Curated annotation (Swiss-Prot):
UniProt entry tagged with the keyword Chaperone: no
GO MF annotations in UniProt: 8-oxo-7,8-dihydroguanine DNA N-glycosylase activity; class I DNA-(apurinic or apyrimidinic site) endonuclease activity; damaged DNA binding; zinc ion binding
Protein name in UniProt: Formamidopyrimidine-DNA glycosylase
HAMAP family per the UniProt record, alphabetical: Fapy_DNA_glycosyl
Disulfide bonds: none
Cited CDD domains: EcFpg-like_N
Cofactor(s) needed: Zn(2+)
Residue ranges of coiled coil: none
Enzyme Commission code: 3.2.2.23, 4.2.99.18
Length: 281
């Protein structure tokens, strides 16, 4: 599933193609993805000018001037690509939503597994929308620091890995970047969340910020479906320290792979966790 860096990469790529442009045509090519597509989506977006394109957690917020906000989630396999209308290939079977601009560009929302979604919200009540209302702070914003993290983890005895995947604790984090951040901070994924305080919390916040920033700069991680808006792959997967590297040497210490087995894998809440048992405490 695309995590914060992948969604932010898509936002950055779509912004010059959409913001300030009028939508000359919008097409919904099926009635539903994960949720039903609003029956008035085409009518309410066609002819509108895009005022801004923001991100909240793993959601894209396409804001119209004098119009609604389109909330988009890429689901497990979704991507959004930009191309010229002239000479553009016919939409494929997995190209479900099309946005065409008066400037002659088409943005295609493709989602083979159909776990993504698009819906509409009113700008005045956007923060109270059911998909957004309970989200935690953005980890790259000034609203997120060690004090905030400690407060949100207070009283939680669940493992820190599970707590960080809770979108109500911190918004936008997923399995890849939580594993990578915990490794950088030297924190075991099994450690009780409420015990991450003081210098540990400072280290974790710094690690989260660093990992996310580096991943965005690399265009995200392309393990299966993620593509940038020009169709290019992200390449942060080549810089993983622990994720999907079971049995390989740990880059943070002098692990003896023959003795320790290298990077380990375990399953937490149905998700694979990768870590170094020697480095992370």
């Amino acid at each position: 599933m695309p995590e914060l860096p992948e969604v932010e990469t898509v936002r950055l790529g779509l912004t010059p193609a959409l913001v300030g442009e009028r939508l000359s045509r919008v097409a919904a090519r099926r009635p539903a993805l994960r949720l039903p597509i609003p029956v008035d989506l085409v009518q309410r977006l066609t002819g509108k000018v895009v005022g801004s394109l923001d991100r909240r957690a793993k959601y894209l917020l396409l804001r119209m001037i004098d119009g609604p906000v389109a909330l988009i989630h890429l689901g497990m396999s979704g991507s959004m690509t930009v191309g010229p209308l002239a000479g553009h290939a016919e939409p494929g079977p997995h190209d479900h939503i099309l946005f065409e601009t008066e400037a002659g560009l088409r943005v295609t929302f493709r989602d083979p597994r159909r776990f993504g979604l698009i819906t509409l919200a009113e700008p005045e009540t956007l923060d109270d929308h059911p998909l957004l209302a309970k989200l935690g702070p953005e980890p790259l914003s000034e609203a997120f620091d060690a004090e905030v993290l400690v407060r949100r983890l207070n009283g939680r005895q669940a493992p820190i890995k599970a707590a960080l995947l809770d979108q109500g604790v911190v918004a936008g984090l997923g399995n890849i970047y939580v594993s990578e951040a915990l490794f950088r901070a030297g924190i075991s994924p099994l450690r009780p969340a409420a015990s991450v305080t003081g210098a540990w919390a400072e280290a974790l916040v710094a690690a989260i910020r660093a990992v996310l920033g580096e991943a965005i700069a690399a265009g995200g991680s392309s393990l299966r479906d993620h593509r940038q808006t020009d169709g290019a792959l992200g390449y942060f997967q080549h810089r993983f320290a622990v994720y999907d590297r079971v049995g390989q040497p740990c880059p943070g210490c002098d692990c003896d792979v023959a003795r320790t087995g290298g990077i380990e894998r375990m399953v937490q809440s149905g998700r694979s966790t990768f870590f170094c048992g020697r480095r992370q405490r």
